[in-house]
């Protein structure tokens, strides 16, 4: 038996399965014949007993109970071998199924590789044709036939003349020049009669902000407390009322040490109501104070943001001539008034 079990290696599983089925069939038939011979007293076939190879010393034509027991044990052994062969067959089927699936995947991959190879071959031929055409165009010097020639010509010979022509032919209106000159005039020249210590007129300003302008700007002004609190810069909330002044001690000590008076529950309720009534008034007063502080702090900012007043700058170079003309006009007016009075 062990030899037969160990033999199941290196040979097809179908041969072992067919052999085990035939052995099981032969032993079971012989066992049933022994049962019939015991029941009827008929003789057995000695050739079948020899084929079974039972460990019997004397093989007789008549069935005995000992022979029946040996046949049953032999049938059990053959059945075990047959069951082991079936298990191996099941494993073989699983492995064969996996092999078939892998073969299908390999076939699909082979098809994909073949299609990719064909596409690669087509692309290669297409690129070869394009390169050959471009080489011909480059050798012939026809820049209009291929894109490569156009790029090379643009890189080798930049069109500087055309760009210069565009710059020269570009028109600029006088209004644009005047407006631009007006914008930069306040920072490029000083006013007539400028003095270094005197403040500048509203139309003129220095090219860079001065110290006074920087000090009066928003960067040098301290923001109000509620703004500091909003950005997390204030350590104490100034808008909340302080309750320390309103809280009274529950014990009042008189002149003597022993005289200690404790307030009743009604008095405590009255004090709490008074404190609750005073809280909104204190909050309103503090909010008004904070608003006044913010307004006072924002006044320099508003003064900066307000547009400067227009100043009439007298740029007359000959004030004496103008004054004499004005005097003549006044004399004429006086003469006319006198004539009217005499009339």
Swiss-Prot record:
Q: Name one GO biological process term.
A: regulation of transcription by RNA polymerase II
Q: Which portions of the chain have biased composition (kind: Acidic residues)?
A: 317-343
Q: Where is this region: Disordered?
A: 247-343
Would I find Nucleus among this entry's keywords? yes
User: Which InterPro entries has this protein been placed in?
Assistant: Mediator_Med4
Q: Which keywords does this chain's UniProt record carry?
A: Activator, Coiled coil, Nucleus, Transcription, Transcription regulation
**GO CC terms:** core mediator complex; mediator complex
The yes or no answer to whether the keyword Nucleus is present is yes
Stretches assigned to coiled coil: 86-125
Chain segments annotated as transmembrane: none
Instruction: Quote the biased-composition stretches of kind Low complexity, using this chain's numbering.
Output: 271-316
What subcellular locations does the record give? Nucleus
Task: Name any one GO molecular function.
Answer: transcription coregulator activity
Q: How does it assemble?
A: Component of the Mediator complex.
Role noted for this protein: Component of the Mediator complex, a coactivator involved in the regulated transcription of nearly all RNA polymerase II-dependent genes. Mediator functions as a bridge to convey information from gene-specific regulatory proteins to the basal RNA polymerase II transcription machinery. Mediator is recruited to promoters by direct interactions with regulatory proteins and serves as a scaffold for the assembly of a functional preinitiation complex with RNA polymerase II and the general transcription factors.
Family of this protein: Belongs to the Mediator complex subunit 4 family.
Tell me which PANTHER family the record gives: MEDIATOR OF RNA POLYMERASE II TRANSCRIPTION SUBUNIT 4 (PTHR13208:SF2)
> What is the designated name of this protein?
Putative mediator of RNA polymerase II transcription subunit 4
Q: Which organism is it from?
A: Dictyostelium discoideum (Social amoeba)
Name the lineage. Eukaryota, Amoebozoa, Evosea, Eumycetozoa, Dictyostelia
Which gene holds the coding sequence for this protein? med4
């Amino acid at each position: 038996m062990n030899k037969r079990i160990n033999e199941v290696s290196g040979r097809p599983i179908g041969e072992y399965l067919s052999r085990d089925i035939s052995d099981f069939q032969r032993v079971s038939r012989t066992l049933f014949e022994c049962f019939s011979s015991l029941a009827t007293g008929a003789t057995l076939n000695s050739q079948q007993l020899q084929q079974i190879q039972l460990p019997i010393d004397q093989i007789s034509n008549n069935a005995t109970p000992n022979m029946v027991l040996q046949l049953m044990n032999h049938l059990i052994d053959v059945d075990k071998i047959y069951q082991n062969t079936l298990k191996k067959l099941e494993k073989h089927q699983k492995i064969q199924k996996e092999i078939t699936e892998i073969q299908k995947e390999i076939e699909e991959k082979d098809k994909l590789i073949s299609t990719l190879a064909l596409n690669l071959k087509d692309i290669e031929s297409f690129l070869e044709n394009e390169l050959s055409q471009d080489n011909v165009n480059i050798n012939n010097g026809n820049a209009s036939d291929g894109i490569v020639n156009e790029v090379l010509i643009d890189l080798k010979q930049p069109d500087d003349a055309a760009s210069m022509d565009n710059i020269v032919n570009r028109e600029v209106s006088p209004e644009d020049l005047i407006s631009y000159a007006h914008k930069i005039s306040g920072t490029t020249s000083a006013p007539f009669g400028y003095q270094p210590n005197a403040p500048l007129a509203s139309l003129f300003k220095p090219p860079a902000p001065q110290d006074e302008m920087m000090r009066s700007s928003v960067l040098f002004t301290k923001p109000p407390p509620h703004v500091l609190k909003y950005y997390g810069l204030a350590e104490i909330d100034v808008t909340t009322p302080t309750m320390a002044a309103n809280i009274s001690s529950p014990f009042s000590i008189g002149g003597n040490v022993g005289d200690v008076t404790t307030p009743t529950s009604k008095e405590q309720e009255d004090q709490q109501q008074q404190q609750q009534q005073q809280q909104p008034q204190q909050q309103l007063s503090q909010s008004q104070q904070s608003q006044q502080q913010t307004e006072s702090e924002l006044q320099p900012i508003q003064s900066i943001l307000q547009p400067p007043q227009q100043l009439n700058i007298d740029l007359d170079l000959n004030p004496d001539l103008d004054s004499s003309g004005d005097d003549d006009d006044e004399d004429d007016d006086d003469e006319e008034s006198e004539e009217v009075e005499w009339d």
